[in-house]
Amino acid sequence: MKLPIYLDYSATTPVDPRVAQKMCECLTMEGNFGNPASRSHVFGWKAEEAVENARRQVAELVNADPREIVWTSGATESDNLAIKGVAHFNASKGKHIITSKIEHKAVLDTTRQLEREGFEVTYLEPGEDGLITPAMVAAALREDTILVSVMHVNNEIGTVNDIAAIGELTRSRGVLYHVDAAQSTGKVAIDLERMKVDLMSFSAHKTYGPKGIGALYVRRKPRVRLEAQMHGGGHERGMRSGTLATHQIVGMGEAFRIAREEMAAESRRIAGLSHRFHEQVSTLEEVYLNGSATARVPHNLNLSFNYVEGESLIMSLRDLAVSSGSACTSASLEPSYVLRALGRNDELAHSSIRFTFGRFTTEEEVDYAARKVCEAVGKLRELSPLWDMYKDGVDLSKIEWQAH
């Protein structure tokens, strides 16, 4: 077993060696290095063939038509293209958008920008379980609503929204529905032939592919129209200009092919590891699971260790790569906005750690990690006067603290 142990698979995944091999074949003079847009010679034709094969592989994972897959630089760009693209194209029909308070920042910062441009955005509060229900969406719909953006799997707490049910509702009301699915590919089955989802964002690097490449699913029937956010050359049917990065696209295709073939077995294995880890750390007192216990992906365990500072705990777990909050916001010392939206108090939100397991996690690593967590929490609580008071039966919620 090698240290440190990587348990932050929701931040990024290592590239699968099979993916890396395919990517290396598209870089050098001996490989498939051509520009897919070069129509006048065999180098371009071969590159285009590789790109279209990858487009098919991405489409197959989610049961879509390959023509509905648009290459982007990642899920952040896909979210921007979907939300701004729909908002700008449909601004004459209405200027109201619905999303949730626990979306990824790529969605929330995009809707904030649209608010500055004169759009109105409703931010739905999740339940304590971290779920956004169709009823919540229905209550917020208005005559001038043009778009709903509610994610599939939450990046911090791993909860899984019922996007099929939300899609039924939005389609019946003639409102477009965008889903950020960066965290769900390879973890949850997605069938876009059956689901009434209009736009869906994907990322390669959350699914053992390379960073810097993603895709946006844009439904053809009924047809979804977008305003491009990137201009120059008219690539990707005018929706996203820029020379296609063959090696990254081929990597994403191969990663999604592997995900499709191995998803069921991998999820079963990871569910076992996650359960094993949770059972061991649950021998500690005052450990809380954040988010629904049932509607969640097995890969994610977001736990709060009461009376322990999350940042101190991370410092104590030097041999474990884990995070507090998502990688995109964990540099800020504010408690997680996702946990606060769930109604967690600041103390519990501050004491949360996200453990995320993946393809290369082993039982030995999980046992070692659980042991280290139990030791670290025990030591930190020994130093905590609040823990002593709790053990003495003091109700800390009733104490009025004096400001100095």
Curated annotation (Swiss-Prot):
Keywords: 2Fe-2S, Cytoplasm, Iron, Iron-sulfur, Metal-binding, Pyridoxal phosphate, Transferase, tRNA processing. The keyword Transport does not apply. GO terms for molecular function: 2 iron, 2 sulfur cluster binding; cysteine desulfurase activity; metal ion binding; pyridoxal phosphate binding. Disruption phenotype: Essential, it cannot be deleted. InterPro entries: Aminotrans_V_dom, Aminotrans_V_PyrdxlP_BS, Cys_deSase_IscS, Cysteine_dSase, PyrdxlP-dep_Trfase, PyrdxlP-dep_Trfase_major, PyrdxlP-dep_Trfase_small. [2Fe-2S] cluster binds at C328. Pyridoxal 5'-phosphate binds at A75, T76, N155, Q183, S203, A204, H205, T243. Its cofactor is pyridoxal 5'-phosphate. Its EC number is 2.8.1.7. The active site is at C328 (cysteine persulfide intermediate). GO terms for cellular component: L-cysteine desulfurase complex. The keyword tRNA processing applies. Pathway: Cofactor biosynthesis; iron-sulfur cluster biosynthesis. Its main location: cytoplasm. It comes from the Bacteria. Belongs to the class-V pyridoxal-phosphate-dependent aminotransferase family. NifS/IscS subfamily. HAMAP family: Cys_desulf_IscS. This is Cysteine desulfurase IscS. It comes from Azotobacter vinelandii.
